[in-house]
């Protein structure tokens, strides 16, 4: 966000809490999908960027978070090892939750990653509506195409509900309208 000269950009804490809040408000308590646990998803979102507090916010491709996650994993291993010291809470549960997010192998991890992506695209849309001249059209296409990287049905539903169908983001989609008209002429 700083590259686009956004004044007072979202902090890591604000991003984490916003993602957590999206999940709290919009995810169902139960789902027929085997292994689904809203609590585990919420825990994953609570710790998913914990290492960024130490290593800093990193610019990554949302569809290929592997490098960022690997770097964070090393930091978190050290942090959670401190839970083995006397008089320090055992953080093994949260390390296991983060490892689940890192590996992305179950429905909860995939849902948490989808929520993380949706929250980030939502933030882009908010910033675009405030600072439209800070973003080229290619940014709009790039951010909106992140929908293709979602992994869960609930992720697609929430993306549509919170972004695509959000009337407050009409400016984002309107910025692409002239291009669409040109494409129809060809």
Segment roles from a protein language model:
Residues 1-186:
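Alpha-helical, largely C-terminal catalytic domains
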């Amino acid at each position: 966000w700083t590259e686009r000269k956004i004044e007072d950009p979202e902090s890591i804490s604000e991003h984490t809490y916003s993602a957590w809040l999206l999940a709290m408000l919009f995810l169902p308590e139960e789902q027929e999908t085997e292994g689904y646990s809203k609590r585990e998803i919420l825990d994953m979102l609570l710790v998913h960027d914990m290492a960024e507090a130490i290593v800093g916010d990193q610019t990554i491709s949302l569809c290929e978070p592997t490098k960022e996650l690997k770097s964070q994993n090393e930091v978190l291993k050290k942090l959670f090892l401190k839970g083995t010291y006397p008089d320090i809470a055992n953080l093994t549960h949260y390390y296991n939750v983060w490892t689940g997010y890192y590996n992305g192998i179950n429905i909860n991890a995939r849902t948490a990653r989808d929520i993380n992506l949706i929250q980030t695209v939502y933030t882009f849309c908010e910033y675009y509506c405030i600072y439209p001249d800070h973003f080229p059209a290619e940014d709009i296409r790039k951010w909106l195409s992140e929908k293709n990287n979602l992994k869960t049905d609930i992720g697609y539903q929430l993306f549509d509900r919170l972004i695509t169908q959000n009337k407050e983001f009409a400016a984002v989609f309107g910025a692409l309208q002239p291009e669409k008209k040109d494409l129809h002429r060809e």
